[in-house]
Structure formats: C-alpha cells, structure tokens
Amino acid sequence: MPKILHTARYIGLPLEILKKACPEGFWVKTLDEATPAQLIKEAADADYFLVSGRLPIDKEVLDHAPQLKMIQRTGVGVEMLDIEAIKQRGIPVYVNGGVNAQSVAEHTLALMLSCIKRLPQINHQTHSGIWRKQQTGVTTHELKGKTVALVGMGNIGRIVARMLQAFGAKVI
C-alpha cells in the first residue's frame, strides 16, 4: 500500500480530516515528532511527501527516500524544499497556489489601514485617557487619492490592487 508521509505532527481533528481525505488504497503516516531524524527515518519507505511545517526537504532527506514519486506542499511557500535536488531526481512538486491569497490580501490591507490611520498610536493614547484629537496631536490620512506601489502582481498582489482601487487609491 503506498505511503504518504506527512512531514508535520498533526493530532486530533486535523489528523482525522487528513486521514479521511486520504485516497483509498493509500495510508498516511504523520510524524510523531517533527524532527529531521524522524523525517529521514520515515522517508525510507515513503512514496509521497505531504509537506507541512518547516522541516527541510533537502538532499539528505531525498537520499533516504528512494521510492519518492511526488511532493505536495500543503501551503504555497517552497523555502523548505531543496528545489534543485528535487529537480535532479525528477520528482514533481505541487503547491496550493492562491489558497490563502484572499486572507493574506485582506491582512495586507488591514496593516496598510492601521499604518495610515495610525491605529496603534491612537489605541495607546485612548487607553491612556487621551482621546481628543487636539490633545493627541495625531493626524490620520486616507487611502483615497494616494499612490501605492505594489511589488509583485501574483495572486495576492492582484487582490490587494483591486481593494486599493476600491478605496480610491492609484496602484502602480
């Protein structure tokens, strides 16, 4: 039966969900301890890696995974993967591109609004008993009419751009 090695420690409901999602005829092994040593040990008979967390999938791990056929990342980042070593072995890698793009874009906009509205300063002063604008000296601004430069127009960048345009900002 093909083995899917999940490279993180899941317990409780997340583990139940993962096991229910496992295709018939496969079995999922999660790491009891998410350590490099256990990953190397369990990689020996793994057919597939389901990569969560930050354990590196490097040349050493791959050397201990002779029957590895595919790597699936549960998120979008691949910084823990030695892409060059994986390519040399001809192992396909899949990611969940865009899976969290909306959430990250909303968080990005929330941080922008927090900065431009000076929410941390206003919150601190309000909790200190100072709440009148004249007493605080706090000046806030708005996004409307501002020019915002975005670096990268991938899944997240495009959503942030649409949100900023809805606020009346010019995006470059």
Where are these regions (language model features)?
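Short phosphate-binding/catalytic loops that engage adenosine nucleotides
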Residues: 26, 91, 169
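Short gly/ser/thr-rich secondary-structure transition/capping motifs
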Residues: 28-34, 51-53, 128-136
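Phosphate-coordination loops involved in phosphoryl transfer and adenosine-cofactor binding
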Residues: 1, 68, 144-147
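Short secondary-structure boundary/capping segments
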Residues: 19-20, 40-41, 84-85, 139-141, ...
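N-terminal glycine-/charge-rich "phosphate-binding" loop or analogous flexible N-terminal tail
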Residues: 1-46
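Rossmann-like dinucleotide/phosphate-binding beta-alpha-beta segment
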Residues: 137-172
